[in-house]
Amino acid sequence: MYLLNKTPLFLEFLKRFMNKAGYVFEDENIQNKLFLHSKCNCKQKDCATVYLYSKKPFKEDSTGINIFNTNKGYIIVHILDEGYFEFEALLYKKYPYKKEIDKFFNKNRKIDKKVPKLKNKIKKISDKDMKKIDDYFNDFEILEPNIIDLGEIDFNEINKKD
């Protein structure tokens, strides 16, 4: 596992998105609670999925899956009670942190259970990169979910056929 401090773009993106989505962290310094575990290896150009890990398992009432349909793509937050946290970002080629995460995990980094020593210092984000994040969130919207009404299902009717 690796410190979130090593990926300042992703850390800033994560903080801003989670704030907009209504998630509240007890500790504002989420970089001291969540660690980079790995990234998705699907190799799709529009996938920017990152897997995180928390030393302390999540409370049962905070676990689950939330799907956010945004004007910039889909973001799926999947929190598991074992301490894993999946931040799945799909269908948008310009997530500001994608290159940073790809580069970070492209160095043949091992996936291990060793939790790194905490450091408060976060790598500084360049003005250019901060502008990318600002531009991304400037017109960012969480849209109403796309729901398809399939009508009612009569489970009694299904049981009769079996």
For every predicted segment, state its role.
Residues 1-63, 99-162:
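N-terminal domain-onset segments
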Residues 45-101:
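Amphipathic protein-protein interaction modules
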